[in-house]
């Protein structure tokens, strides 16, 4: 019985303390971003003022988000690699988009701009200014279209 009470008390302690580790969002200075993220901002968003930069610390993960005054947003991994770029009122800088994806969009949607790009371990997703979503595998082959 004593053992059961100890297990229950330990479980209750873990459950009540878990929220303290999850979702710890806090603003940070741009200088606190990983060096890779700072270099990315200087290379692709030079001259655009940062409105907000923040870190989101989860129990086993951390990521960063930067919002610019022009409405653009960039999310970075814990290592400072970009994972999501959204340019609400403009176009994603061309140098961010892999050449094969730019070529595909230019050929098949010549009057469209890429307004967002997202990448992960499995694929790239881009959104065009008409709301059309295109998904590419890591070899840049189109694998899905989302209207």
Question: Which role does the model predict for each range below?
Answer:
Residues 6-13:
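Hydrophobic helical h-region of N-terminal Sec-dependent signal peptides
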Residues 23-147:
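Interaction-mediating elements
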């Amino acid at each position: 019985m004593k053992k059961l009470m100890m297990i229950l008390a330990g479980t209750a302690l873990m459950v009540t303390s878990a929220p303290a580790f999850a979702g710890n969002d806090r603003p940070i200075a741009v200088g606190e971003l990983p060096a890779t993220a700072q270099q990315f901002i200087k290379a692709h968003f030079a001259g655009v003022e940062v409105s907000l930069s923040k870190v989101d610390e989860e129990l086993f993960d951390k990521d960063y988000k930067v919002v610019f005054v022009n409405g653009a947003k960039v999310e970075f991994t814990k290592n400072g690699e970009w994972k999501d770029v959204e340019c609400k009122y403009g176009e994603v800088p061309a140098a961010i988009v892999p050449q094969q994806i730019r070529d595909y969009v230019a050929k098949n949607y010549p009057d469209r701009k890429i307004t967002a790009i997202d990448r992960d371990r499995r694929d790239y997703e881009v959104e065009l200014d008409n709301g059309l979503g295109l998904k590419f595998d890591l070899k840049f082959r189109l694998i899905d279209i989302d209207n």
